């Protein structure tokens, strides 16, 4: 019996879920992502022939394609059920082309959730492949290939070898570089915040503390001093009390970018992690499609939420809402990210899946709940001998509404009001006793560095990238080492506190740690130099508006309003000549080079620049008779800010620590960090050990530890077969033989093996591998290309 229908999706997990909903007439197979792409090592685009792409089937997909071809041949109908965005449409088109499918036997189906209802409905309403969506994806892929392929050699020649440039990535790095420069240029300004604590009788006559604050900051210490002196003899009176109702409305359901931001703030997930977990939830039928910029909910979801809220919390919490999408070209998927079944408040799954699902469920439910109703009371307190006034605010929740389920988190650059409490009962004209009044020196903060989440928000705000590109962009800039995620240690600073208590004024200086930041995106020196170089020679590539306008053009292609080749021609006409002229230009200085001054000993110039393996300090120049001396920068140092003194410190290496068994022990710095050299062996210094401070004893201890670890790796050798060795690796014991590794079965003690037993294991595993490669291999699931 042959199933009449073949359904092809892009991932095995998705195939497994869909298979449950379709009868025995359907067979569901996976393409494991793209089955065809531009050639890896070649340009693969024929510019003369209207930018015709030259696609190839990667080696690891050939067996899979063969299987799919055979299965498609035997089926009456082939259903292409890849995801419903441009990327999915392109996968469907490549399958159609490569498998040589016939139009009358091929149907394209789309759905944005994997539920029985959605799948059966999709099968009732098939459509043709939308070539406009395919062209939009193809245009992005080809434009990105042109930029990457033509710009990278320019960087190899002008900055350093092995660099690569990407269209959206380069702009993302520019944002991070510019933010770092804003921070370095930032001048902090001081002002004084004045707060008072008053003692007020509560309903039972007991005195309670009530906090109040001066409505504005005072500019100088003298002004603060003067105000506190006035308060010494002042009478404090409640001049006015206002009470007004305040409503808070819930946030819209999640889009890709808001989910990435909230998961980072609430769960500490990286953007890539969020997408990986969300993909698993989508493919197992728990949530709708996770690449979307729409906040729309289906009627079904709104009704499902309504029932769930009424059952759990009662009718007064229900408030159905329709949200509309602001993003231009929100075409990727036509619904927000929400649970497939609103009645499921919890799911089975891994800890991460449960956490992310819980977040999505709460956000969706909250979006369909009533406003929170609060009452805000503000009391104005006059000071008898000055025109200044204090203000005390209190808030009371009359009805919690959606807050019962969900509160939105904020980034550290959004000012948050302190938690406010209920005010004690107050009357107009009431006189107040103060307990203390404090003027504290505060400072303006530099703009915060980006987190992954706030960078996504910025990219979306600027219209750069799309739901499918945020995560890959953020991963790529870190993989290429243009940006690193790191913590900034704070610095100590002192500040003034002037206090009035019991009519006495005291003046104190205190210290605090300021500016500490965790898991922020910091530009590397390479990232900074590449950004400056590209901004100078390729201003349009680095321009935010230009990058956003390219995204809009992709949207126009997807709508069928523009031909994709027209956009390619326009872009290439200006881009290609600037590549040619930049390559030909002669530069007097190396890109990013900074002269720090002269070496006090030799009088030669000292400069910093990007060397082959990263940032270096150089003494002397290539024209000198003597070869220049080089030293890599230490972690935390930057070519933008390093001083001559700090640079000279680096040349104190190599340091001789002493002798051991007649051989010298030295410490030095290399491209991978500081190391100890002794008797032909190199031992890396662990993090936190300073090469300028390490002593001989500690160095010998590290050498010994390394030797012991090495010895543990080598379990057994045989004289009669010197190429064979039993080793201990990170995944357990194995046999190393002629450049290949063979796993030792768990039930065998590796030290007990003799040579014959080893050869038997090798023979068995080689035969097994040979028979496995003869079968059609399951292709790897390659991640979607941005």
Predicted regions span which residues?
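Intrinsically disordered, low-complexity regulatory segments
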Residues: 2-142, 150-151, 215, 225, ...
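Basic, low-complexity terminal or inter-domain segments flanking catalytic cores
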Residues: 3-6, 17, 26, 152, ...
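Short, polar/flexible loop-turn hinges at active-site or ligand-entry regions and domain interfaces
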Residues: 54-57, 82-84, 101-107, 127-134, ...
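C-terminal or mid-to-C-terminal helical accessory/interaction module adjacent to the motor/catalytic core
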Residues: 114-198, 243-247
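Residues forming anionic-ligand binding surfaces in small-molecule and nucleic-acid pockets
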Residues: 236-261, 330-343, 433-437
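Short acidic, hydrophobic short linear motifs in intrinsically disordered regions
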Residues: 238-242, 249-263, 288-292, 446-458, ...
């Amino acid at each position: 019996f042959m199933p009449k229908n073949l359904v092809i999706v892009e991932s095995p997990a998705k195939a497994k879920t869909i298979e449950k909903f379709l009868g025995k007439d359907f067979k569901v197979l996976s393409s494991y992502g793209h089955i065809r792409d531009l050639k890896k090592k070649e340009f693969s685009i024929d510019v003369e022939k209207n930018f015709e792409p030259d696609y190839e089937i990667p080696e690891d997909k050939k067996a899979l394609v063969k299987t799919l071809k055979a299965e498609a041949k035997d089926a009456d109908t082939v259903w292409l059920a890849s995801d419903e965005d441009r990327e999915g449409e392109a996968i469907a088109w490549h399958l159609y082309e490569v498998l040589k499918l016939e139009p009358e036997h091929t149907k394209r189906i789309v759905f944005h959730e994997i539920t029985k209802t959605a799948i059966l409905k999709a099968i009732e309403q098939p459509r043709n492949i939308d070539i406009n969506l395919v062209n939009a994806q193809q245009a992005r892929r080809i434009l990105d290939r042109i930029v990457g392929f033509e710009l990278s050699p320019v960087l190899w020649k002008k900055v350093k070898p092995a660099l690569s440039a990407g269209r959206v990535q380069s702009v993302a790095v520019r944002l991070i570089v510019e933010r770092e420069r804003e921070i370095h240029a930032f001048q902090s300004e001081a002002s004084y915040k004045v707060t008072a604590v008053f003692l007020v009788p509560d309903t039972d006559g007991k005195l309670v503390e009530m906090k109040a604050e001066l409505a504005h900051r005072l500019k100088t210490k003298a002004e603060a001093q003067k105000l506190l002196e006035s308060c010494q003899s002042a009478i404090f009176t409640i001049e006015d009390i206002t009470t007004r109702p305040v409503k808070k409305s819930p946030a819209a359901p999640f889009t890709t970018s808001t989910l990435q931001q909230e998961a980072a703030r609430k769960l500490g997930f990286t953007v890539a992690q969020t997408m990986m977990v969300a993909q698993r939830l989508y493919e197992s039928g728990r949530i709708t499609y996770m690449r979307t910029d729409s906040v729309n909910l289906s009627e079904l979801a709104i009704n499902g939420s309504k029932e769930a809220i009424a059952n759990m919390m009662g009718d007064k919490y229900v408030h159905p809402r329709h949200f509309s999408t602001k993003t231009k070209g929100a075409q990727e998927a036509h619904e927000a990210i929400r649970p497939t079944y609103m009645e499921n408040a919890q799911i089975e799954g891994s800890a991460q899946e449960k956490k992310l699902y819980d977040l999505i469920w709460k956000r969706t439910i909250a979006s369909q709940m009533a406003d929170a109703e609060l009452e805000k009371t503000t009391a104005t307190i006059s000071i008898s001998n000055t025109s200044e006034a204090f203000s005390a605010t209190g808030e009371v929740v009359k009805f919690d509404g959606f807050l019962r389920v969900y509160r939105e988190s904020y980034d550290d650059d959004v000012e948050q009001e302190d938690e406010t409490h209920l005010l004690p009962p107050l009357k107009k004209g009431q006189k107040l006793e103060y307990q203390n009044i404090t003027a504290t020196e505060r400072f303006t903060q530099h703009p915060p560095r980006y987190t992954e989440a706030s960078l996504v928000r910025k990219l979306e705000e600027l219209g750069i990238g799309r739901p499918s590109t945020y995560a890959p962009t953020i991963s790529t800039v870190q993989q290429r080492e243009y940006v690193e995620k790191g913590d900034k240690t704070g610095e100590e600073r002192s500040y003034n506190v002037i206090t009035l208590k019991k009519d006495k004024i005291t003046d104190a200086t205190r210290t605090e740690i300021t500016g500490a930041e965790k898991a922020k995106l910091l530009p590397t020196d390479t990232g900074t130099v590449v950004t400056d170089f590209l901004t100078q020679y390729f201003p349009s590539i680095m321009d935010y508006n230009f990058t956003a306008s390219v995204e809009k053009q992709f949207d126009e292609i997807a709508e069928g309003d523009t031909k994709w080749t027209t956009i390619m021609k326009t872009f290439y006409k200006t881009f290609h000549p600037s590549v040619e002229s930049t390559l030909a230009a002669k530069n007097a200085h190396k890109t990013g080079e900074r002269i720090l001054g002269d070496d006090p000993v030799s009088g030669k110039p000292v400069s910093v620049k990007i060397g082959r393996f990263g940032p270096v300090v150089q003494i002397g120049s290539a024209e000198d008779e003597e070869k220049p001396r080089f030293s890599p920068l230490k972690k935390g140092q930057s070519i933008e800010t390093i001083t001559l003194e700090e640079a000279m410190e680096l040349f104190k290496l190599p340091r001789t620590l002493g002798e051991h068994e007649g051989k010298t022990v030295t410490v030095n710095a290399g491209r991978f960090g500081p190391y100890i050299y002794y008797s032909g062996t190199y031992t890396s210094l662990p993090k936190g050990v300073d090469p300028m401070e390490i002593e001989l004893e500690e160095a010998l201890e590290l050498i010994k530890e390394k030797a012991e670890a090495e010895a543990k790796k080598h379990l057994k050798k045989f004289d009669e077969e010197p190429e064979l060795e039993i080793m201990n690796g990170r995944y357990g014991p194995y046999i190393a033989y002629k450049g290949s590794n063979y796993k030792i079965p768990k039930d065998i003690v590796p030290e007990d093996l003799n040579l014959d037993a080893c050869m038997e294991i090798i023979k068995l595993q080689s035969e097994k591998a040979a028979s496995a490669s003869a079968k059609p291999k399951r292709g790897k699931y390659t991640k979607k290309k941005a």
